[in-house]
């Protein structure tokens, strides 16, 4: 964790009280003590620092022996956090891979994620526990705290890529995309397109890849092909590699 984040409901009168994994990190990694300053922020809000006012010791974790506690801090949040620079249309991989991927997506600066059904997406995915906000939100939060930013990605579902595109919902969701890129092995494009200061919309297919028809559909709606080389990559690898290639240098 490079920044401890609080939900807005956790901050009252300029103070926050927290325990769990965040307190465990402060006590065991940062060796927190009263008077120490921490990098903190509020989810979807401002960033800044907080000063530890009190530490209530709790019994150590019996499995790991790590110190536990409840920590009270005085918050000083007055800094804007970097805004997301990319949005993602993702044909989801299996839940286990998706669980690994979500923190990385949050770290990389993605603002909106639309999970779409494609021909090679396993139908069973749509019943996965991972699609519940109570399950995926902590994974995204973990990525934000690692990156030290506050903007929480949003996730929505579209069971059919074709209907999502042809019925105009994609254009309604992303009317201001500076460029649109679809990842596809063997594509002719050798370099990443420029997107200036605008947000980029990236479409990444399932582990079996987009079908030719799906690629053609996306191309007909303004997407340019971009290849990461001849190798077939797992979805979690492809997402991180493509975002890193497109990421603006600030």
Task: Name what the model sees in each region.
Residues 212-250:
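Structured adenosyl-cofactor binding patch, chiefly the S-adenosyl-L-methionine
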Residues 175-215, 223-227:
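Active-site/ligand-binding-proximal alpha/beta "capping" segment
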Residues 1-79:
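N-terminal positively charged helical leader segments and presequences
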Residues 57, 117-121, 230-231:
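Short, ordered loop/turn segments at secondary-structure junctions
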Residues 76-180:
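RNA substrate-binding interface of SAM-dependent RNA methyltransferases
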Residues 26, 98-101, 214:
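Hydrophobic side chains in well-ordered alpha-helices
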